[in-house]
């Protein structure tokens, strides 16, 4: 009699795990990834706001789009990925003549590493669920506001998990 209940329990557990139901360890990993994403976005914001980095001055005039709906779920990170590609394009503009090539390369390498890490974390957080299609608001924001809004998103997600 207990054998049937045990087998039913095992089958249900396997079905939940196979369908991506959150487990305590996956929630812990998600929290770590969201925290890492938050820290990387904050570091990227510091780099963008650095007045010594003249190369980034062009980026401050570029317009970024935010999701039409208030981003509240991990699936909305797909919108961040899409706009991050544009951010990379802006950063690959011609180098400033006021800085020597080594300073530009070092600074841009740091930023590229941060953005690559952000993309990796977002892809890990999304898992196989990357089919979400973003709808963007007609209003645009500048780079600093763009990063601040995604930082706020990560803080909100992290606080709901704790």
From Swiss-Prot:
State the InterPro entries in the record: 4_helix_cytokine-like_core, IL-2, IL-2_CS
What the entry lists under Pfam families is as follows:
IL2
Query: What processes in GO biological process is this protein linked to?
Result: adaptive immune response
Q: What is this protein called?
A: Interleukin-2
State which gene encodes it: IL2
Signal peptide segment? 1-20
Compartment annotation: Secreted
Q: Which GO terms describe its molecular function?
A: cytokine activity; growth factor activity; interleukin-2 receptor binding
């Amino acid at each position: 009699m207990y054998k049937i209940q045990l087998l039913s329990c095992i089958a249900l557990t396997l079905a939940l795990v196979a369908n991506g139901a959150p487990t305590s360890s996956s929630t812990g990993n998600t929290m770590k990834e969201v925290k890492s994403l938050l820290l990387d976005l904050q570091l990227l914001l510091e780099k963008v706001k650095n007045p010594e980095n003249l190369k980034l001055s062009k980026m401050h005039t570029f317009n970024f789009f935010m999701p039409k709906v208030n981003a509240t779920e991990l699936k909305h990170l797909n919108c961040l990925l899409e706009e991050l590609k544009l951010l990379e394009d802006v950063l690959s503009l011609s180098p400033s003549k006021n800085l020597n090539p080594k300073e530009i390369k070092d600074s841009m390498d740091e930023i590229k590493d941060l953005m690559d890490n952000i993309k990796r974390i977002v892809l890990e957080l999304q898992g196989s669920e990357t089919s979400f299609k973003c709808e963007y608001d007609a209003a645009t924001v500048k780079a600093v506001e763009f990063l601040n809004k995604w930082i706020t998103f990560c803080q909100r997600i992290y606080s709901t998990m704790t």
